[in-house]
Swiss-Prot record:
Signal peptide (UniProt feature, chain positions): none
KW Cell inner membrane (keyword) present: no
Gene name of the encoded protein: pfdB
The protein's name: Prefoldin subunit beta
HAMAP family per the UniProt record, alphabetical: PfdB
UniProt source species: Methanospirillum hungatei JF-1 (strain ATCC 27890 / DSM 864 / NBRC 100397 / JF-1)
CDD domains: Prefoldin_beta_GimC (cd23162)
Assembly information from the UniProt record: Heterohexamer of two alpha and four beta subunits.
Stated role: Molecular chaperone capable of stabilizing a range of proteins. Seems to fulfill an ATP-independent, HSP70-like function in archaeal de novo protein folding.
Residues that span the membrane, as ranges: none
Amino acid sequence: MQNISPKVQNQINMLQQMQQQMQTILSQKSQYELAAQEARRAVEELKETDDSAAVYMNVGTVVMQKPKSEVISKVTEKIETLEIRIRSIEKQEKMLQEKFEKLQSQVRSEIEGRKTPDAN
C-alpha cells in the first residue's frame, strides 16, 4: 500500500464512499419495499372486509373512522408513491453500481500497472 500513488489512494477512498452510499440506498429501498408490501396486504384485507365494517385510518396523530373506499384509495396512492420511490432508488443504485465498477476497474489497472514493472 505504500507504493500507491495519491491519485489511486483517492480513488480507493471514493470506492469506499460509494460502498457506503450503496448500503444507504439499499437500506432505503428495503424500507420502501417493506412498506409497499404491508400496504398491499392492507388493501387485500380491506377488499375482503364487508362494506359495512368500520374502517379506521391514521390521520396525523389521530385515528379516524373513514369509508372503506376512501381508505383503499389512500393506501393505493401510498403504494403508487412507494413504487415510484423504489424505481427511483433502483435507478440510483444502477448508476452508482456502474460508476463503482468503472472506478474499481481503473484502480485495478493502476495497481496492476505498478506491479508489472516490479516483476521484471
